[in-house]
């Protein structure tokens, strides 16, 4: 599917007359001209908040986007539709933080998204939080294209850095035994140090119970923390009634520093 036309419709809902003229003037350029427009976008486009946005790809949310970011994504899509992979790779190589955020956020809408799989997995290793979050959160690209190893690395990085894993699209669908076992090992390390893990991480284990994980859930049941007790109850319920706990896990989708005692 070609997404640029749908994105343009959304842009025109929020752009003022001068911004509309600027976007129209750049839309017919070649890949080099579009790349220049991508870099220049913040000079001509405001940071108007995008609200009540369309859902054109499952899991791809523009909820926190600004207009200049959406215009950049539109331009990226135009370059992709012109088979401008070389130009996009050049933009990746030279991007400052906000440009990199837009590039990674745009990946699900590109003409040949798998061409940029290495770029996406590199973003998981980025030390720039906003770049990491642009691929990890409200972005279906990892769920669609990451290997199990790359997926697990992304989820674990979120957990280790106390980031909100419920913002990862496809979290339950991509759960796997290796990830569940690693979470158990991580919990044992935290507990040995007198620390906790965020209670909602246990949503990833019901399909993969083994002796170690069963022991972990029993430990949660005996916790003094009501969030841990609720997590244990939800794991048990999910085992008995698969798919029944999705809404209830939302009660645990709150900031919960992993280093709290």
In which residue ranges do the predicted regions lie?
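Eukaryote-skewed repeat-based solenoidal scaffolds used as protein-protein interaction platforms
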Residues: 76-190, 206
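N-terminal alpha-helical scaffold/docking segments in eukaryotic complex subunits
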Residues: 1-81, 154-261
């Amino acid at each position: 599917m070609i997404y640029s036309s749908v994105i343009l419709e959304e842009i025109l809902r929020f752009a003022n007359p001068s911004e509309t003229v600027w976007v129209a003037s750049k839309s017919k350029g070649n890949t080099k001209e579009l790349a220049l427009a991508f870099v220049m976008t913040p000079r001509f486009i405001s940071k108007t908040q995008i609200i009540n946005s369309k859902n054109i790809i499952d899991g791809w949310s523009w909820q926190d986007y600004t207009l200049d970011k959406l215009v950049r994504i539109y331009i990226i899509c135009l370059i992709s539709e012109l088979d401008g992979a070389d130009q996009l790779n050049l933009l990746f190589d030279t991007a400052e933080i906000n440009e990199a955020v837009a590039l990674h956020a745009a990946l699900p809408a590109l003409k040949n998204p798998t061409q940029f799989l290495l770029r996406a997995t590199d973003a998981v290793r980025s030390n720039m939080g906003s770049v990491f979050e642009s691929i990890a959160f409200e972005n279906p690209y990892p769920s669609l294209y990451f290997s199990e190893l790359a997926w697990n690395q992304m989820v674990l990085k979120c957990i280790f850095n106390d980031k909100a894993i419920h913002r990862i699209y496809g979290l339950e669908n991509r759960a796997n035994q290796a990830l569940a076992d690693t979470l158990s090992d991580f919990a044992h390390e935290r507990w040995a140090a007198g620390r906790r893990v965020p209670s909602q991480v246990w949503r990833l284990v019901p399909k993969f119970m083994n002796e170690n994980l069963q022991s972990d859930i029993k430990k949660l049941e005996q916790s003094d923390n009501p969030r841990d007790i609720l997590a244990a109850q939800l794991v048990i319920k999910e085992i008995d009634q698969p798919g029944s706990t999705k809404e209830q896990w939302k009660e645990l989708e709150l900031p919960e520093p992993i280093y709290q005692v």
